[in-house]
């Protein structure tokens, strides 16, 4: 499962590129060839995280 990733600058959905990186294990260089927008390229390069286990809820400390 790949969590949705949307570029905050242009609003483009770049989940498919994230899928290629995480699931298909393609290199970042190969994936960035098909990405035209500089803002999307930057987001993919800097904000890719591995899959997270969302069954554990983070604790919220209001103090």
From Swiss-Prot:
Enzyme class per UniProt: transferase
Pfam families: Chordopox_RPO7
Entry GO CC: DNA-directed RNA polymerase complex; virion component
Signal peptide start-end: none
A GO biological-process term: DNA-templated transcription
Subcellular localization: Virion
Function: Part of the DNA-dependent RNA polymerase which catalyzes the transcription of viral DNA into RNA using the four ribonucleoside triphosphates as substrates. Responsible for the transcription of early, intermediate and late genes. DNA-dependent RNA polymerase associates with the early transcription factor (ETF), itself composed of OPG118 and OPG134, thereby allowing the early genes transcription. Late transcription, and probably also intermediate transcription, require newly synthesized RNA polymerase.
Quaternary organization: The DNA-dependent RNA polymerase (vRNAP) consists of eight subunits encoded by early viral genes and termed according to their apparent molecular masses Rpo147, Rpo132, Rpo35, Rpo30, Rpo22, Rpo19, Rpo18, and Rpo7. The same holoenzyme, with the addition of the transcription-specificity factor RAP94, is used for early gene expression.
This protein's name: DNA-directed RNA polymerase 7 kDa subunit
The organism of origin for this protein: Vaccinia virus (strain Ankara)
Gene from which the chain derives: OPG090
